[in-house]
């Protein structure tokens, strides 16, 4: 996000979001779309069982949206600023570059963000290069962020991710992405860590290693139990007190490096500091600490064409199916069910530290935003 976009697009949108939150105007289009493009995954993570969806026949792979269906959905949505792609493993979709091209054609995002388990370096690099060429041709100002996951150093990473040899492929992927970033100025390489009971004891080692790689940014978020991940009841989440202490140490390192950042990068890192403090309080207090704008600023699209207010409420409180309304986003977005779910969120009947929603919440909450400025 650059300063011009924030001042001319993002911040003015927050005024409309606040009015919609209080029921004073119809809900405008969201600024963030997260699209789970597939539930196929080669990882066998201790923190996530999404890979079991097809082997255990929870759903059928043939139910996933086609490229043409995706184009129809995007065409009905209008502009989205942040386009987050997730999975499953996104790079296992052969048409991933075509999905990004459809997003460029219809959503016109400023940022495209894709995480990866880094198990298929050649596929990741070839598809990334195809996407970068699409951006070069159609949207040279759009940034592409690829975020390999790093949950431990060496053997621990393979143990947590459940695939022997993942560590070596991760290093290969990061190296090749870093080389690709030298050719394409709009490619950003980021590292992400899921903080769980399996790696909470070695976050300092992980962070020191990440910084030695020279990547542009690093972020972490807490492991959560979600129906989406089929991990309800799994002992994966650190206690609130543990997470708060971990994030306190992590924040100290971020603050120490703030002076080395460019002005806007300092604001971005400061937003993360606010998030870490907020997430620690949410996990500890088990409540919404600031108002949540899920289903207003952000929306989640499943591989099957269902809209969720967020991936945490997901199966429990879906907004509706786009396949049932001829792929017309507005019909679900402005439905009575969507209004009912937004009331539930506003009444603070749920709470979670979901990162991409939390950043939108911070931008819409003036006291929190001022902390980052």
Regions found by a protein language model. Give the residues of each.
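Conserved alpha-helical substructure of the radical SAM core
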Residues: 2-144, 226-227, 238, 373
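Residue-level signal for mature regions of secreted extracellular proteins and peptides
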Residues: 34, 38-41, 285, 303, ...
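General secretory precursor processing signal
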Residues: 44, 48, 152, 295, ...
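Flexible mid-to-C-terminal extensions adjoining Fe-S/redox cofactors in radical SAM and related proteins
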Residues: 10, 16-18, 24-29, 51, ...
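Generic structural signal for small/hydrophobic residues in well-ordered secondary structure
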Residues: 37, 41-42, 66, 124, ...
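Radical SAM enzyme [4Fe-4S]-AdoMet core and its adjacent flexible, acidic
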Residues: 1, 106, 137-294, 298, ...
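Short, flexible loop/turn elements at secondary-structure junctions
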Residues: 41, 89, 116-118, 150-152, ...
């Amino acid at each position: 996000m650059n300063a011009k976009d924030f001042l001319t697009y993002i911040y003015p949108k927050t005024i409309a979001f606040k009015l919609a939150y209080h029921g004073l105007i119809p809900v405008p289009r969201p600024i963030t779309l997260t699209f789970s493009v597939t539930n196929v995954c080669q990882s066998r993570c201790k923190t996530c069982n999404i890979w079991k969806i097809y082997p255990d026949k929870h759903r059928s792979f043939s139910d996933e949206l086609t490229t043409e269906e995706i184009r129809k959905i995007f065409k009905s949505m209008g502009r989205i600023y942040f386009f987050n792609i997730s999975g499953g493993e996104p790079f296992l979709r052969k048409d991933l570059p075509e999905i990004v091209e459809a997003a460029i054609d219809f959503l016109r995002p400023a940022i495209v963000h894709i995480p990866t388990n880094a198990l298929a370096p050649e596929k990741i690099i070839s598809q990334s290069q195809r996407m970068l060429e699409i951006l070069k041709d159609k949207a040279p100002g759009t940034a592409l962020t690829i975020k390999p996951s790093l949950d431990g150093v060496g053997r621990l990473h393979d143990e947590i991710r459940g695939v022997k040899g993942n560590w070596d492929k991760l290093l290969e992927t990061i190296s090749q992405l870093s080389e690709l970033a030298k050719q394409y100025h709009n490619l950003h390489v980021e590292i992400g860590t899921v903080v769980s009971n399996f790696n909470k004891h070695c976050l300092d080692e992980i962070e020191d290693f990440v910084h030695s790689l020279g990547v542009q940014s690093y972020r972490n978020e807490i492991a959560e139990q979600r129906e989406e991940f089929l991990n309800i009841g799994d002992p994966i989440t650190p206690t609130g007190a543990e997470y708060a202490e971990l994030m306190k140490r992590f924040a100290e390192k971020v603050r120490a490096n703030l002076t080395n950042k460019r002005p806007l990068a300092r604001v971005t890192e400061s937003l993360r500091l606010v998030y870490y403090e907020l997430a620690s309080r949410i996990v500890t207090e088990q409540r919404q600490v600031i108002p949540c704008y899920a289903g207003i600023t952000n929306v989640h699209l499943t591989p099957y064409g269902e809209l969720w207010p967020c991936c945490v409420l997901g199966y429990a409180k879906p907004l509706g199916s786009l396949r049932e309304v001829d792929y017309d986003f507005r019909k679900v977005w402005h439905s009575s069910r969507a209004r009912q779910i937004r009331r539930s969120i506003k009444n603070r009947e749920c709470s979670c530290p979901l990162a991409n929603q939390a950043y939108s919440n911070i931008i819409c909450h003036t006291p929190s935003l001022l902390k980052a400025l």
